[in-house]
Amino acid sequence: MEKRPDPVRTEIIRNGLVAITEEMKSNLLRTAYSMIIYEAQDFTVGLFDAEGNTVSIGIGLPMFIRGMSHTVRRMLEHFAEREGKRNVDIGIYPGDVLVTNDAYLTGSHLNHMTFVVPIFADGALVAFSACMAHWADIGGALDGMTKDIYSEGLQVPIIKAWRRGEPNHDYLDFIRMNVRIPERAMGDLNAQVAAVRMGARRFNQLIDRYGLEAVQGGISAIMDHTEARAREQVRAIPDGVYEAESFMDDDGVDAGKRVRIKVKVTVADDQMTIDLTDVAAQVKGFYNSGEAAGKACCQVAFKCLTSPLEKPINEGSFRPLNIILPPGRVVSAVRPSPMRWWMTFPMTIVDTIFKALAPAIPDRVISGHHADLLSAALNGRRPENGRLWLLSGGLIGGGWGAKQGADGSSATICINDGDTHNSPVEQVEAKYPLVIERYGLREDSGGAGTWQGGLGTEKIVRAAADFMFNAQVERVQCRPWGLFGGHPGTGNQVSVRVGPEKELRFPTGKVLARQLQTGDAYILRAGGGGGFGTPLDRPLEKIEDDLHEGYISRKRAEGCYGVVFKGGTNQIDVDATRRRRTDLIDRPIPPDALDPEESAVMSADDEAKLFTRGKSFLARCC
C-alpha cells in the first residue's frame, strides 16, 4: 500500500510542483527566440508521472492539457512497441530527449513542437518533464488554404533529439535544412530542451529532499483531493441531460456553409459525460483539430465549472468527466485532414457546453464570448536587406460573456488560450515594418443585459512595407449569444484600408493571400461578449459609468437600456427612464438595430480592384 505524507508535507509538495512548472515557464520565456513564445506565450510546460498522467501543468494554454499527456503516453507505448518487436534495447534512458510534432497526437498543428525528458530516480523511470511550444515556421505553405496535412510543414514522428545525453545530429540537421529561419528554430529548440531539463532537475531535487515515496504519495493525495473537489461540484448540478447547439461560419473552402456544433451533457450524481457525437464531420479547410484537442475543450469547460482555482491542474481534476468523441469529427480529425488553424472551433465547443448547462446552473456559466484569436498571418521581405519576415500579427483580446452578478471581461484572450498575451506594440514596431495606429476598446460591442458583455477591441495596423496578409477569423456570423434575456455581442470583423480614407470590411473573416502595400492598413475587430439578463434591469448608475468611460453610446443607452436623458445633457432622467422601461417591456428594440457600423462591406468588385496587385509581389516575396 502506498504511503502518503501528512497534510502539511503534501501541501509543501503541491507548491513544489507548481514552483517547478512556473520556473520551467520562466526559463523558456527568457531564452526563446520567437516573439510568439516569449511575448505571446504560446506554449505550456508540465510534469507527468511514469504512466503519462498529468501531475502539474503550468499556467499557460489550457488547450494543451490533453495533448501533452496524450503525447507522453504515446511515447511510452511507442518505445515499448519498438523494443518488443525488434528485440533490441531501444527503450527510454537518462539523458534522452524525446520529440514530436505529430498533429494527430497533440491534437493541434505542426507548429507545436513537443519535447519530453524522462526523469529517473534510483534507476527507475518515475516521471516526465514536457514542453509544447509554437514555432514560427515549420515549413509548408505560407499563404492560402491548405487541403491536407502534408502541405502544412514538416511532420516529426516520435524520435530522440538527444540519446543518453548526446545530440541526434541527423534530427537537428534535418530541422535546420527545412525551415525558413533556422537560427530562430534552433534557438527555440534549445530553449525548450533547457526548460524540460530544468524541470527534470527540480523534480529530482524534490525527491532528494523528501524521498521518492513521499513525493509519489503526495502526488496521489493531491490528485485524490482535486478529484473530490470536482465531484462535489458536479453533485451540485441537477441530474439530467442538457443539450445546446451553435455553429461556425464555414470551413474556409465551402464559403457560407455552416459547420454545426452540437453538444450533449449528461449529469448523474458525481459524474459528468460530454458527448460530441453530433458535432460536424471533419471539414475540407484547415480548421480541423485532433482528438486530443476535442477532449481538451471538454476538460477546459469542466475545469471552469468545477475547480477553476485548484492548482496544480492534474489528472484528478478530470476523473469525474467522461468524454464521448468518435473519430472523424471536426475536433477528432484523422489523417490527412489539414489542421493549421486547429484552435478555432474548440473555443465555440466550450461556449456551447456552458450554454447547454445554463438552465441547470445559471449562477456558474457565462454567456457567449468572442471565441477567436483574431490572428493575422503576415509575411514579407525587409526593404533594407530582402530578408524574409514572418509574424502572427493578431492575438488580440475580445469580450467575454457576462454572468449572473458580473459584467463580462473586456479585451480578454479567448477562453481556450488562457495565459497567452498580445505582443507589445513597441516590440512589433521595432522588429517588423508595421505601425500600430490604434489598439483600443470597441464602443457598443458588448451585448446589453442586466450584466453587460465585455467589450471587444479594435486594432489598426499600417504597412510600412509591402507584405502578404492572411486572416483566419471565425464567429463573424455566429455572434456571442446572450443568456436569460441578454443581447448578443457584436461579431468579429476583418477590414482593410487602402490609402488614408477608404475602409472596406470583408464579408467573411477568412482572407487568404492578399497583398497590402506601403500605407495600406488591416483592421481586426474582436467581438463583444453576450449579455446576461434583461437590459431593462441594468442599474442606472452602471449605465452612467459606461457612458462616462465610453463603453456605450447614447444611442445604445436609449435603445437597449431604455434611458431618457434630460434635455441635451448626458444626465439621466430617472423618472422618465422608469416609465419608458415599463413601455419597452412589451415592444423592445431588436438588438441588431443598434449594432455599431464601423465600415462598409466589401463587394466582389471592390475586392477585385483592390487585390489585383498581388501576383508580382508573390513572386518577389515567396
Describe these PLM feature segments:
Residues 1-121, 125-622:
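Glycine/proline-enriched, intrinsically flexible loops and inter-domain linkers
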